Amino acid sequence: MLGMIKNSLLSTVETWPYRVLSKGEKEQLSYEERECEGGQFAVVEVTGKPFDEASKEAALKLLKYVGGSNDKGAGMGMTAPVSITAFPAEDGSLQQKVKVYLRIPNQFQASPPCPSDESIKIEERQGMTIYSTQFGGYAKEVDYVNYAAKLKTALGSEAAYRKDFYFCNGYDPPMKPYGRRNEVWFVKE
């Protein structure tokens, strides 16, 4: 627990590497097309709970893992964003299922420590191209759904992207009150 607190308060945060391919603005919404690197990720899946509750539960498990709850007892340092896979229902609301990802820090990419919590899996993910929009505040389900709808409208019918899921991303620790960064990502097809 101490490692988790130290990680969130004192560590520098390593950001998931990406390259901006293009920028756009439409319908009063700014967005970017980015190429994100692949790599090793710690993943927790939670089902049967509302989005906000499931996301918080999974994120706490991942924070404990990078804080030292692993076979090496290694405090790995925090990475950003915490990336939540959301699965939209037909009406645009979110299903009661999330997969929360945290990219393993670069120095542990080659050989990630094994999680002590069996619900955490280590997955290799390929790089991907995304459409991204950013917003501030303490993001909840309603905010992510709202910005996903805005991004969908801004992209229009010209852009091809996955419709069966999207990513809800938070970059900041809970104790940061101002200047928060949240993003919605659609994966380009």
UniProtKB/Swiss-Prot annotation:
InterPro entries: Reg_factor_effector_dom_sf, SOUL_haem-bd. PANTHER family: HEME-BINDING PROTEIN 1 (PTHR11220:SF22), HEME-BINDING PROTEIN-RELATED (PTHR11220). Belongs to the HEBP family. The keyword Membrane does not apply. Forms a distorted beta-barrel structure, with two helices that are packed against the outer surface of the barrel. Porphyrins are expected to bind to a hydrophobic patch on the outer surface of the beta-barrel structure. Pfam families: SOUL (PF04832). It comes from Gallus gallus (Chicken). This is Heme-binding protein 1. Keywords: Cytoplasm. GO terms for molecular function: heme binding. Its main location: cytoplasm. It comes from the Eukaryota. GO terms for cellular component: cytoplasm. Monomer. It is found in: Cytoplasm.
